[in-house]
């Protein structure tokens, strides 16, 4: 699964390099086995945001794209769509993606994170609970480097802990998140059922190292 995520990420035209941040040596070996780059981090991070901040603190970059390892079908064009607004508007701090909910079953599913926005596309709230007028959140974030490092230094917010959603720390501390709608569906793997669905989608391509 990690190879699909990695190769789809580097295929995005606005991504210049990719690096897997992990605290598991097995993942490092897996990434290196297909020619990818990976780095070990501390084991005590509360979220992926905190983990990549440890790595980014050592790197010279302006923007950071956080593609979560459980998004094996993320589209390179969707990644570019999330990056582009921060290149075009210097006032934006963070961005992420959303897609239409597939139906009431997704609205009710705690594994499907929902997001609602204001009229400008700025996130108002993320939740695992049903919310009127919400869309399905796709687990990808783009940050300005300084915003990411600031965010990682802030304490966890009560709602972040309650919902187990790292992006709520940003909202709680007044960091704006632009939400970019996309029609590119992404099959995130959060449950055994999700994993089986992705396997079925990839089954026709068995033997191919990765599928675009």
Question: Residue ranges of each PLM-predicted region?
Answer:
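Short phosphate-binding loop-to-helix
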Residues: 19, 25-84
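N-terminal glycine-rich phosphate-binding loop and ensuing alpha1 helix
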Residues: 1-21
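A conserved hydrophobic position in a structured secondary element of the catalytic/binding core
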Residues: 22-23, 74, 143, 190
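Class I S-adenosyl-L-methionine
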Residues: 10, 28-32, 37, 171, ...
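Hydrophobic/aromatic residues located in beta-strands of well-ordered beta-sheets
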Residues: 18-20, 64, 95, 123, ...
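Conserved alpha/beta core of the MobA/IspD/sugar-nucleotide pyrophosphorylase nucleotidyltransferase superfamily
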Residues: 134-212
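Conserved core of the sugar-phosphate nucleotidyltransferase
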Residues: 16, 75-157
């Amino acid at each position: 699964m990690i190879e699909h995520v990695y190769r789809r990420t580097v295929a995005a035209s606005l991504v210049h390099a990719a690096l897997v941040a992990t605290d598991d040596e097995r993942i490092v070996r897996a990434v290196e086995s297909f020619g990818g780059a990976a780095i070990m981090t501390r084991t005590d991070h509360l979220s992926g945001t905190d983990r990549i901040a440890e790595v980014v603190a050592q790197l010279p970059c302006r923007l950071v794209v956080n593609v979560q390892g459980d998004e094996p079908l993320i589209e390179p064009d969707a990644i570019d769509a999330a990056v582009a607004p921060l290149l075009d508007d210097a006032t934006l701090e963070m961005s992420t993606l959303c897609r239409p909910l597939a139906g009431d079953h997704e609205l009710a599913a705690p594994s499907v994170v929902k997001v609602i926005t204001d009229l400008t596309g700025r996130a108002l709230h993320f939740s695992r609970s049903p919310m009127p007028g919400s869309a399905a959140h796709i687990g990808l974030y783009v940050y300005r480097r300084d915003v990411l490092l600031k965010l990682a230094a802030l304490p966890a917010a009560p709602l972040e802990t309650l919902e187990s959603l790292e992006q709520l720390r940003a909202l709680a501390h007044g960091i704006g998140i632009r939400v970019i709608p996309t029609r590119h569906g992404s099959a995130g793997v959060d449950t055994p059922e999700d994993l089986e669905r992705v396997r079925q989608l990839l089954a026709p391509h068995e033997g191919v190292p990765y599928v675009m």
